[in-house]
């Protein structure tokens, strides 16, 4: 979703989900190539063209991936549970401390989005994003019943 969003303020806007439907979902359903120009967060504009030729499987990841535009077409929906502090720490480690204020605002917006879209309740599988028992992800997975 980060490549579809268009900046912090427009990330969960109706335009985002319209673009998502037109650029990703519609071509996928029509067995066509997916084409869009991804958003560059540092330049604050769309820059690099992306082409995915007729994918048989597509994983869409991110906060907005639980929107109805995607959800109704998804064959499997995952919910990853992670403590807010751990989540923001991971993002700041990846993207830098300079986005800390935007991330605090984003967490409020994503929480509202999750509630409005019943994201957690509509998921097929829940995954612990910070398990107490560490696993070797190269050879193990954990399955639980909700």
What are these regions (language model features)?
Residues 80-116, 123:
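Conserved catalytic-core segment of NTP-binding enzymes
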Residues 46-94:
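ATP-dependent NMP and nucleoside kinases share a basic, alpha-helical "lid"
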Residues 72, 76, 93, 97, ...:
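NTP-dependent small-molecule kinase module
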Residues 6-8, 67-68, 87, 134-136:
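Conserved protein kinase catalytic core
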Residues 1-58:
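Conserved nucleotide-sensing/catalytic segment adjacent to the nucleotide-binding pocket
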Residues 4, 63, 130:
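Anionic group-transfer/hydrolysis microenvironments
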Residues 17-21, 60, 81, 100-103:
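Amphipathic alpha-helical transducer elements in NTP-driven molecular machines
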């Amino acid at each position: 979703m980060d490549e579809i969003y268009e900046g912090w303020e427009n990330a969960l806007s109706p335009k985002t989900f319209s673009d998502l439907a037109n650029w990703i979902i519609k071509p996928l359903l029509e067995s066509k190539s997916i084409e869009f120009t991804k958003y560059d967060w540092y330049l604050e504009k769309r820059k690099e063209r992306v082409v995915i030729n007729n994918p048989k499987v597509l994983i869409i990841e991110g906060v907005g991936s639980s929107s109805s535009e995607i959800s109704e077409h998804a064959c499997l929906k995952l919910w990853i549970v992670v403590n807010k502090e751990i989540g923001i720490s991971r993002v700041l480690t990846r993207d830098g401390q300079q986005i800390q204020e935007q991330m605090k605002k984003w967490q409020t917006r994503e929480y509202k989005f999750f509630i409005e879209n019943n994201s957690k309740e509509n998921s097929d599988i829940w995954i612990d994003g910070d398990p107490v028992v560490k696993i070797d992800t190269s050879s193990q997975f954990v399955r639980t019943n909700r």
